[in-house]
């Protein structure tokens, strides 16, 4: 079974192609002996598994290939709403909840969830401010909602416009 959630101290967590550059850079700094906040990285494969389990791949492709935003809007809405409203598959949810509990046990109730898209911080684009970060999360529900919101942020209008400007589509990338 694939590991979808890894501690930042694990060597594999420094893989930006799986976890996105934000998480991978945090992991690499920790591996170099620099102090980092404790945390976990979510594999972008978890995002794809969630999309597939919800039957959203046709909407993903349709939104990505639409030439006009107006043509993509209904598909984007379906993806975003489904990511918020439909259950997270157990193979993804269980390690997320285990990681959350580990953080609560180590650091207390207030947690942070940050997005880490695979294409962030590439040459010529930073994506600064395009996605989401959530601070002060206390409950399990808030934590899971924040993960969902990070996944859905890949489909936000501002992010899509930025990606279009840089010749990227949400179907070509994923969110860790």
Residue spans for each PLM region:
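N-terminal beta-alpha lobe that positions the nucleotide/phosphoryl donor
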Residues: 1-176
């Amino acid at each position: 079974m694939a590991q979808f959630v890894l501690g930042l101290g694990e060597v594999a967590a420094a893989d930006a192609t799986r976890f996105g550059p934000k998480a991978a850079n945090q992991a690499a700094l920790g591996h170099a002996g620099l102090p980092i906040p404790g945390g976990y990285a979510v594999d972008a494969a978890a995002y794809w598994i969630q999309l597939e389990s919800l039957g959203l791949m046709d909407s993903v492709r349709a939104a990505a290939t639409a030439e006009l935003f107006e043509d993509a809007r209904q598909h984007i809405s379906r993806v975003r709403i489904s990511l918020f409203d439909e259950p997270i598959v157990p193979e993804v949810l269980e390690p997320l909840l285990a990681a959350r509990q580990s953080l609560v046990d180590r650091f207390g109730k207030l947690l942070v969830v940050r997005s880490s898209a695979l294409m962030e911080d590439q040459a010529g684009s930073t994506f600064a401010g395009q996605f989401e970060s959530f601070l002060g999360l206390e409950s399990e529900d808030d934590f899971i909602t924040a993960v969902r919101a990070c996944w859905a942020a890949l489909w936000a209008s501002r992010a899509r416009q930025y990606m279009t400007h840089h010749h990227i589509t949400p179907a070509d990338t994923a969110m860790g």
